[in-house]
Amino acid sequence: IQQYRNSAESGKKKAISAEFCCVCEKNIVPLQRKFKGNILMLIGRKNESQVLLEALNADEAQFVAVYGRRRVGKTFLIRETLRDHFVFQHSGVANSPKHIQLQAWQESLTEAGLPVEPLRNWMDAFAALKRLVKNSRKKKKVIFLDELPWMDTQASYFLPALEHFWNSWASARNDLMLVVCGSATSWIIRKVIQNHGGLHNRVTTKIHLRPFTLLECEEYTQYKHLNFTRKQITEAYMIMGGVPYYWSCLQASLSMAQNIDSLFFSPEGKLCDEYSALYASLYKQPANYIRVIEALATKQTGLTR
């Protein structure tokens, strides 16, 4: 907050977040998107975008893991930075068994230009992916697997198939970049980044995508033409944090209080069910965690043993 206050007191133009906006005494002129060569700049995501581009330009195969809480903008960052290099992109299906996951994978292969017969297992799925990559004429080939934890269903042997794909073939190619992503942060860390099996030390780049800072939230409101005062922006930050999706739901025609009421407390509000959805995205059995939070909420000073 002190950094936020200091930006208002300065009478000089200065760079904030290294090229994302110019801050003046009374005005912020944000540049939410601009191109520098072929580099797409995003509010609050320059460092992460640059890390992805450095991995893209590496001389050897890259295994990139991007993780962070729900709605923080992981998929948006990856697509906006790397979309021109995708040869295959796929997203897991929430709360669905193995055969549904494989059917969705088959559909993604078809959309990418490789019609295949129904897949029996994950080994077949990754074998088909190999054929797709081999057929691509792109100089750099990016495979983007979104919501990876959802694919790892019970007794599906998804992880062993992924390990085999990377260790036996993908890691030997200098034109390949595998990007995996998921909102279940604990799963990504435990099963991929800190894996003690076939994926041990295989991740070459990891990105923990965090919410916007308070200053970045102001930049976003200026870009969206939301004429809120700094007091209102600070209040919204105390309520919603810096989660980009939540800020994208704000409407310029409503006051901040009206926005919050409409989003969170209206039965039809976009974020009315976010509480339960957030826990469901983080944990396979969210009910226990929700009960803990609800128990703590009954006491003003919390609970002790």
Role assignments for model-derived ranges:
Residues 1-305:
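Phosphate-binding site recognition
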